[in-house]
Swiss-Prot record:
The chain crosses the membrane at residues 3-23, 68-88, 133-153, 179-199, 256-276, 281-301, 380-400, 418-438, 501-521, 540-560. One of its GO terms (molecular function) is P-type potassium transmembrane transporter activity. InterPro entries: KdpA (IPR004623). This is Potassium-transporting ATPase potassium-binding subunit. It is found in: Cell inner membrane. The lineage of its organism: Bacteria, Pseudomonadati, Bacteroidota, Flavobacteriia, Flavobacteriales. The gene is kdpA. PANTHER family: POTASSIUM-TRANSPORTING ATPASE A CHAIN, POTASSIUM-TRANSPORTING ATPASE POTASSIUM-BINDING SUBUNIT. GO terms for cellular component: plasma membrane. The system is composed of three essential subunits: KdpA, KdpB and KdpC. It comes from Flavobacterium johnsoniae (strain ATCC 17061 / DSM 2064 / JCM 8514 / BCRC 14874 / CCUG 350202 / NBRC 14942 / NCIMB 11054 / UW101) (Cytophaga johnsonae). Belongs to the KdpA family. Its main location: membrane. It comes from the Bacteria. It is a multi-pass membrane protein.
Amino acid sequence: MNTELLGVIGIFILTIVLAIPLGKYIAKVYLGDKTLLDPIFNPIEKFIFKISGINSAEEMNWKQHLKALLSINIVWFFLCFFVLLFQGSLPLNPDNNPSMTADLAFNTAISFLVNCNLQHYSGESGVSYLSQIVLMFLQFVSAGIGMAAAAMIFTAMKERTTEKLGNFYNYFIKSCTRILLPLSAIAAVALVFSGTPMTFEGKDAITTLQGDHVEVSRGPAAAFIAIKHIGTNGGGFFGANSAHPLENPTYFTNGVELWAQMIIPFAMIFALGFYLNKRKLANIIFGVMTVGFLLLVVPTVMSEINGNPAITKMGIAQTTGAMEGKEVRFGPAISGFWSIATTVISTGSVNSMHDSSMPVSGAMQLLSMMVNAFYGGCGVGILNYYIFIILAVFISGLMVGRTPEFLGKKIEAREVKIAAFIAILHPLLILAGTALASYFTAHDTAMGYWFNGNATGWLNNPGNHGFSEMLYEYTSSAANNGSGFEGLGDNNPFWNITTGIVLLLSRFIPIIGPLAIAGLLAGKKYIPESAGTLKTDTSIFGIMTFAVIAIIAALSFFPALALGPLAEYFTLK
């Protein structure tokens, strides 16, 4: 086994080992138990609640949680939108970067608001330092929103019969101060000491070894990059994201950034077990997610290590694997692992160019986002999986002739309808958007305001790969991921507006649905467990849930995958 694979395995195992105590700590934070950080953060949180006039001890029902969540996001959207729209005239712009167009500002504000960071611009020339700071703020709060929603779900599952499910603002502030901030500080310090810039000075002029005079972009990158991964956001400070030598300088920083994006999604699963005092249930959920993750990782890593068969046919040896679009300091194995970690977890950061990945890798990256149920982003990963638990419980109950129950609450028609709607919405948004873009491209439609030229102009690659680029853009948007096949010309009104709409719908409806289900179930009468109760903490139920995910989430996309990356794969044979 080569050292590259050992590095991949080592990082994965280390993250799991560290996620267990972090999960215990997260459960304590949401339960209100004492932690080591109380003396530091108690005064800060009291000050925040005092100046904002919020009573953090006031209990809310699920509708009040949603009202608070949605209203605060509206405020943040307009704040970010106007900063981006007028950044050229605002302070902290030493490189004199211009203001964004309205459609790009709309897309960017929504993208960071919903924890996606789709980025139809390049960081070096597209945003000022003030805009970067505002976007970094959104990276914190968008992750905090997802974690607060998960905390409400935890409370709903724990309580026997109640309408009150904690306080949204309490969960949100604690998520930001006690979890995201300390972890981000650790990651940022590691990055700074490894060579990532942390300054408010503008571009630096240098002379290369061959005598060329060039300008190198810098800025407060380390802080931005830390929360981009800890909060599973993924937006790059620089255009090349974590493939950029200043954003991810060494193999060590690559490991830190991989750990950073995986640690909270892993820990949230274990936190569920500690919070409910049901460790076995959490282990089953983690096991199902890990099996799904490995089924996506192994083909990807092997495909990248084995290289491009078209190049092999030319008699050219590929001892280092498929290196197109890869960074030499990382190599194909860990680049392939990162590409699945970042798409499964919904981070969306890249340390290689996904557009240059082998077709099998591209298919696995797409499938990771299409399934959207293994690990997932900060908090929302649990919400997505919760939907499939409800569906699996309902289907299992029908199969054995028992009333569907989950944690002592009956699953009835209303909850199943909500869960089914959420499960169907994801493929609908992806396939409808891709169909629209494909129609315009196939007819070479003159787009007018929507695009400067005919629709084929936004594709740099024809045929199967061009279709994959359009499919990937909408899949990434719907999964709130943010990575892309960057051969697509996406900075224009058509892509900025359509993906912006998909981003909004695919973020907030899948949060509203699980919160509604959890709130409805929490208000129902608790039914004690009996011999006839379907146990949800067994491997059999885990397999059932995996089957539901495979049938509903994965098979819905097979025709689209067959037209794109799978067809491309067979053309290389």
